[in-house]
């Protein structure tokens, strides 16, 4: 598709879709809790829809109400064997978390994914789950999908140190541990998003957290809840970037989640000199309205324990860096290479073709700014975040046309992205 270029200014107020990470977990915990769960603000992107369909296939009643999703929870022991493989689509979160949950069930199931998901390593979950006594098998050394999860009613607790900073791996272990007799202890390499831990407590479960160590005793029973999901900071990130780099822009993003494990982007914006302010802070659901306006930015270094707190925002941070004076260094971000695509290479290719001075490294990128961007024919590589980054980059293009192949990938997390762009466009 052809992308809009030559933006004069983006102005207005916008409410971004519900948080994708929290939406997945809300559906999962609603299904395994006892009683009814009502979810407001759920993201209805393709990834979350895959999770919903998986639980329907496992016998859970899920239906739409006027402004909510209602789940009639069946408890851990109420899931039924699926009559067909569970299709996770493009969703690594769905596959990894469901593998942990289903590892303790008394039936077997096959988890499938699309071409992109079928290239993503699952050994990072099969190893700890196997230590718990689960039987899982994928393809090759990295246990690539399809993934077969064989039923195992009696898992054993483990003490496990995560070799990578991954909330998905942590969550898979926690979902298995909730069904396991005894105490499981997880030691994180770096602190990662804590939505699973928060949701366990929200549904009436118990666990203890001391620094990077999480301890949980099972088995536990969970109770259905009424949930309000804030807007996704990872989706808001693209509009925050647009507001900062498109001259004349002034945007307010309403009801954005500001869980501290996810706000690394906001710290980077402030470090780069961006004009950012918080409004209407709601501490109960950890949300706020964020206002940004066009700013003169400067290059920064991004590395270390900050990386897990902005891992999904690094593509759009790289775009910000192309419009910042000086050099930006992104380090310790090798996890980007095993996302929906190799995001280090994809970001470097797309922005490089558009004229950016950007270089890929083994674990990150080096970006020198400020550089003008020009038209190019590029692809999302099937990655929604690459697609949205490109659409924001195109706004700065004064010469040439930007064409984007496989733009449908954006439906994964933000079905109304281009509609929202039109709402903010000012000639």
UniProtKB/Swiss-Prot annotation:
It is found in: Cytoplasm. One of its GO terms (cellular component) is cytoplasm. Keywords: Amino-acid biosynthesis, Aromatic amino acid biosynthesis, Cytoplasm, Transferase. It catalyses: 3-phosphoshikimate + phosphoenolpyruvate = 5-O-(1-carboxyvinyl)-3-phosphoshikimate + phosphate. Its EC number is 2.5.1.19. The keyword Cell wall biogenesis/degradation does not apply. The keyword Zinc does not apply. It comes from the Bacteria. GO terms for biological process: amino acid biosynthetic process; aromatic amino acid family biosynthetic process; chorismate biosynthetic process. Phosphoenolpyruvate binds at residues 20, 92, 120, 168, 343, 385. Signal peptide: none annotated. GO terms for molecular function: 3-phosphoshikimate 1-carboxyvinyltransferase activity. Catalyzes the transfer of the enolpyruvyl moiety of phosphoenolpyruvate (PEP) to the 5-hydroxyl of shikimate-3-phosphate (S3P) to produce enolpyruvyl shikimate-3-phosphate and inorganic phosphate. Monomer. This is 3-phosphoshikimate 1-carboxyvinyltransferase. The gene is aroA.
């Amino acid at each position: 598709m052809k992308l809009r270029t030559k933006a004069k200014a983006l102005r207005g107020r916008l409410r971004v879709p519900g948080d994708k990470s929290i939406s997945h977990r809300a559906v999962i915990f609603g299904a395994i809790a006892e009683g009814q769960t009502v979810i407001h603000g759920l993201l209805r992107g393709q990834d979350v829809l895959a999770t919903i369909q998986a639980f329907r296939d496992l016998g859970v009643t899920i239906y739409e109400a006027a402004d909510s999703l209602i789940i009639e929870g069946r408890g851990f022991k109420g899931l039924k064997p699926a009559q067909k493989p569970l299709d996770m689509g493009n969703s690594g979160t769905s596959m990894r978390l469901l593998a942990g949950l289903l590892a303790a069930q008394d039936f077997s199931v096959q988890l499938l994914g699309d071409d992109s998901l079928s290239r993503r390593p699952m050994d990072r979950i099969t190893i700890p789950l196997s230590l718990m006594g689960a039987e899982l098998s994928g393809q090759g050394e990295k246990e690539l999908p399809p993934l077969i999860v064989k039923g195992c009613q009696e898992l054993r607790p483990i003490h496990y140190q995560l070799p990578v900073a991954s909330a998905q791996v942590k969550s898979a272990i926690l979902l298995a541990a909730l069904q396991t007799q005894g105490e499981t202890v997880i030691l994180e390499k770096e602190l990662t998003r804590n939505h699973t831990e928060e949701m366990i407590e929200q549904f009436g479960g118990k666990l203890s957290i001391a620094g990077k160590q999480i301890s949980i005793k099972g088995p536990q029973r969970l109770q259905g809840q009424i949930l309000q999901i804030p807007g996704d900071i990872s989706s808001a990130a693209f509009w925050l970037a647009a507001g900062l780099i498109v001259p004349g822009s002034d945007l307010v993003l309403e009801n954005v989640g500001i869980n501290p494990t996810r706000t690394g982007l906001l710290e980077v914006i402030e470090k780069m000199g961006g004009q950012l302010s918080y409004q209407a802070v709601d501490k109960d659901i950890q949300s706020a309205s964020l206002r940004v306006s066009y700013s003169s930015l400067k290059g920064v270094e991004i590395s270390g324990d900050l990386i897990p707190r902005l891992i999904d925002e690094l593509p759009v941070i790289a775009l910000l860096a192309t419009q910042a004076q000086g050099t930006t260094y992104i380090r310790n971000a090798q996890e980007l290479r095993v996302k929906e695509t190799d995001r280090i290479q994809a970001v470097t290719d797309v922005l490089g073709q558009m004229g950016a001075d950007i270089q890929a490294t083994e674990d990150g990128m080096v970006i020198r700014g400020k550089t003008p961007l020009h038209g190019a024919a590029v692809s999302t590589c099937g990655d929604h975040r690459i697609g949205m980054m490109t659409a924001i980059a195109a706004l700065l293009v004064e010469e040439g046309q930007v064409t984007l192949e496989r733009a449908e990938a954006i439906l994964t997390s933000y079905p109304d992205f281009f509609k929202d762009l039109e709402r903010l466009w000012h000639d």
